[in-house]
């Protein structure tokens, strides 16, 4: 293996990952081909044999054995040498492995895949740094206080009390990865409570970076930084959603929702509340309780730590409690029935809350996938929002007529008529 062969290997891995997706997040992943799967373990061994860098491969055997056990059970269940872990086969595979249920199976698979993928990222990071040192030591370009860009990565040059979120925001906004070394520096970072305004604003910039958020978030998550910032995240990390609508685990879905919400920030008066609401809208999942109600309870201490006002916390609780309202109402109720519009009016206090809820509904639907968010469903939601806006402005739903006792008596005898003019 020469250097050019390693470059070929990297390109091959990137192409395969693009085709098969992430083993850690997909609900029906390919155990062998997906990112974080068995072929990535073989690639890590090949990199190690090359000798260009040293990789800790001791724990790879345990990870590989765990994935091979899953694959062996899968082949036994499906009677074929197919490596895609289909939804309808997961319960049987879990039973064969003597696990509690398919949720435990998929959570274990996700955790293993994330570890493999992280080790792969570390390996390529070491390789790229070695190549840089073998030629010349570049100087970092300063982009913010104690933050620079070196070799197309954002790096932390020195530690200060709030540097972690500032570095995450800068990486997300620049569309660059945050270096693995920098992520590891932040493992024990703690902000004062409530968070300073600078940290809160950088959090919004971080999660508002669109598609760039994905790899920065994952690098921080693998280093343990995300759970240090948000301990509540651990309950949904790698948590599977075993239904035909969702594509991703709960945590990955919430990150994807924030990514989709970033494209909608210009449609709302408070982009910060939209982004934070999107990132935590399913934080209540993982128990038998109503996840919307539980999530509304969990967001309160999170938002207090972040430093939001009482009014903003109330808005975030509203968004999480009612994040399914518009989609469920639009698809299950008659939009021509005034009672349908009144149902929304009774729960949504004003136009500002409605626009935030509408944007969150769109982001949630797009992040879930086409099976859950079709053009038809989007049109229904848009129509419901349009009618509700008109009602809020007093142009659609008239107040319910109040009848006198005499009129009620006539109505009971079918003798009451009303003429509108």
Cite the ranges covered by each PLM segment.
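Long, K/E/R/D-enriched contiguous segments that form extended
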Residues: 198-277, 286-292, 297-298, 304
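Extended hydrophobic/Leu-rich segments
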Residues: 3-6, 10, 260-263, 420
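Non-catalytic interface/linker regions that flank or bridge core catalytic/transmembrane domains
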Residues: 1-244
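Regulatory modules associated with amino-acid/nitrogen control
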Residues: 66-67, 92, 96-99, 103, ...
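Broad gene-expression machinery/nucleic-acid interaction feature
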Residues: 38, 275, 415
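Divalent metal-dependent catalytic cores for phosphoryl transfer on phosphate-bearing substrates
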Residues: 55-56, 77, 95, 249, ...
């Amino acid at each position: 293996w020469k250097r050019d062969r390693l470059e070929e290997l990297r390109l091959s891995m990137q192409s395969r990952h693009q085709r098969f997706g992430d083993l850690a997040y997909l609900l029906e992943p390919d155990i062998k081909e997906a990112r974080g799967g068995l072929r990535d373990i073989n690639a890590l061994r090949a990199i190690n044999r090359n000798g260009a860098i040293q990789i800790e491969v001791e724990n790879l055997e345990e990870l590989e054995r765990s994935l091979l056990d899953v694959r062996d059970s899968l082949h036994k269940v499906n009677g074929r040498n197919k490596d895609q872990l289909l939804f309808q086969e997961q319960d049987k595979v879990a039973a064969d492995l003597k696990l509690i249920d398919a949720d435990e199976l998929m959570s274990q698979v996700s955790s293993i895949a994330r570890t493999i993928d992280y080790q792969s990222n570390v390996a390529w990071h070491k390789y790229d740094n070695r190549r840089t040192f073998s030629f010349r030591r570049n100087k970092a370009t300063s982009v913010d206080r104690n933050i620079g860009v070196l070799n197309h990565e954002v790096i932390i040059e020195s530690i200060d009390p709030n540097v972690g979120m500032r570095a995450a925001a800068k990486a997300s906004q620049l569309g660059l990865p945050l270096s693995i070394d920098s992520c590891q520096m932040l493992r024990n970072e703690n902000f004062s409570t409530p968070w300073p305004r600078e940290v809160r604003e950088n959090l919004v910039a971080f999660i508002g970076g669109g598609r760039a958020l994905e790899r920065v978030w994952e690098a921080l998550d693998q280093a343990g930084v995300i759970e240090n910032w948000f301990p509540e995240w651990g309950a949904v990390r790698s948590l599977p959603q075993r239904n035909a609508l969702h594509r991703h685990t709960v945590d990955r879905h919430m990150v994807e929702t924030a990514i989709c919400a970033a494209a909608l920030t210009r449609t709302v008066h408070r982009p910060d509340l939209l982004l934070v609401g999107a990132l935590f809208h399913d934080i209540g999942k993982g128990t038998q309780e109503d996840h919307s109600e539980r999530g509304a309870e969990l967001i309160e201490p999170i938002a207090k730590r972040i430093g939001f006002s009482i009014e903003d916390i109330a808005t975030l609780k509203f968004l999480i409690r009612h994040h399914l309202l518009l989609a469920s109402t639009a698809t299950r109720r008659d939009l021509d029935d005034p009672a349908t519009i009144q149902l929304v009016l009774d729960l949504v206090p004003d136009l500002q809350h409605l626009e935030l809820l509408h944007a969150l509904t769109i982001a949630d639907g797009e992040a879930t996938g086409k099976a859950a968010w079709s053009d038809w469903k989007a049109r229904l939601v848009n129509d419901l929002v349009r009618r509700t806006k008109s009602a809020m402005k007093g142009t659609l739903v008239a107040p319910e007529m109040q009848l006198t006792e005499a009129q009620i008596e006539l109505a009971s005898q079918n003798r009451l008529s009303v003429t509108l003019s």
